[in-house]
Amino acid sequence: MKVTFEELKGAFYRVLRSRNIAEDTADACAEMFARTTESGVYSHGVNRFPRFIQQLDNGDIIPDAKPQRVTSLGAIEQWDAQRAIGNLTAKKMMDRAIELASDHGIGLVALRNANHWMRGGSYGWQAAEKGYIGICWTNSIAVMPPWGAKECRIGTNPLIVAIPSTPITMVDMSMSMFSYGMLEVNRLAGRELPVDGGFDDNGQLTKEPGVIEKNRRILPMGYWKGSGLSIVLDMIATLLSNGSSVAEVTQENSDEYGVSQIFIAIEVDKLIDGATRDAKLQRIMDFITTAERADDNVAIRLPGHEFTKLLDDNRRHGITIDDSVWAKIQAL
């Protein structure tokens, strides 16, 4: 089914206000969920909203909490999220990293006791739109086996790197081949994954998203490489924030809350003039996209460039929502 941005935001706002969330907080949160969905990231927008409400109802998320700065060391700050709403807090933290970068050239905010930030790419994009390089990542509850194991002991720990090119170039990726959100998107659409994404009941690689969801055995991105990256990203976020590691979140909490996150902004224009920056970025992009295609019908992709078209399509033709997901939201 198709809905407009206003209909989608209104549905989110209604549910939030029914939980006695303050009007301004409900409006800002509904706006972010709707923008994420409108951008084409359904897995961490509309599809994730019922799960968000479940955690809100369970008390994992404290909607009126205010993040507090704990430590300030020039370009580096450490904050405690106080388990406030994840996407609103993450936006504030990237804004703060940008402010620090304006003063120091680089800004780093380490956040502890945070909630799921929904679409991590929103915060990298937020920096790149203002002309900064944006880098951020989060740890999570253990939802992926480390390479060589059957049990989930590491997080998907998504990493975002956004570059202020035209259009914005951005990598937004979990350390698994597919996030659980993307497994759900493909399952709801009745699609196999384009490549192996996890293991079946017999320990064999499979493209069946439903089987992987059931078994909780997703495949690390790049096999041992994604597993290794997940571990070191967790270590850095834990140390810089003085927060909880994947092990602590998994073993000490009843659900995924109290995670640790990093937000970095770099003001490129302090290091290179605008014309030179743009020329260098354009040369990189041209060099890549003019390569001979492996398939004449498949364009060479630059990460993040597809979001401009997705956003335009959704604004022109309406936002496609899975009927079952929409029914869940209407029932909340």
Swiss-Prot record:
One Pfam family hit: Ldh_2
Active-site residues, as the UniProt record annotates them: 44
GO terms assigned for molecular function: 3-dehydro-L-gulonate 2-dehydrogenase activity; NAD+ binding
An annotated GO cellular component: cytoplasm
Source taxon at top rank: Bacteria
Main location: cytoplasm
Binding site for NAD(+): 168-174, 224-225, 304-306
Oxidoreductase found in the keyword field: yes
Protein localization: Cytoplasm
EC class name: oxidoreductase
Keywords on record: Cytoplasm, NAD, Oxidoreductase
EC number: 1.1.1.130
Keyword NAD on entry: yes
Swiss-Prot/TrEMBL catalytic activity: 3-dehydro-L-gulonate + NAD(+) = 2,3-dioxo-L-gulonate + NADH + H(+); 3-dehydro-L-gulonate + NADP(+) = 2,3-dioxo-L-gulonate + NADPH + H(+)
Family (UniProt): Belongs to the LDH2/MDH2 oxidoreductase family. DlgD subfamily.
PANTHER family referenced in this protein's UniProt entry, alphabetically: 2,3-DIKETO-L-GULONATE REDUCTASE (PTHR11091:SF3), OXIDOREDUCTASE-RELATED (PTHR11091)
Role according to the record: Catalyzes the reduction of 2,3-diketo-L-gulonate in the presence of NADH, to form 3-keto-L-gulonate.
Record's subunit section: Homodimer.
Protein name: 2,3-diketo-L-gulonate reductase
Natural source organism: Salmonella schwarzengrund (strain CVM19633)
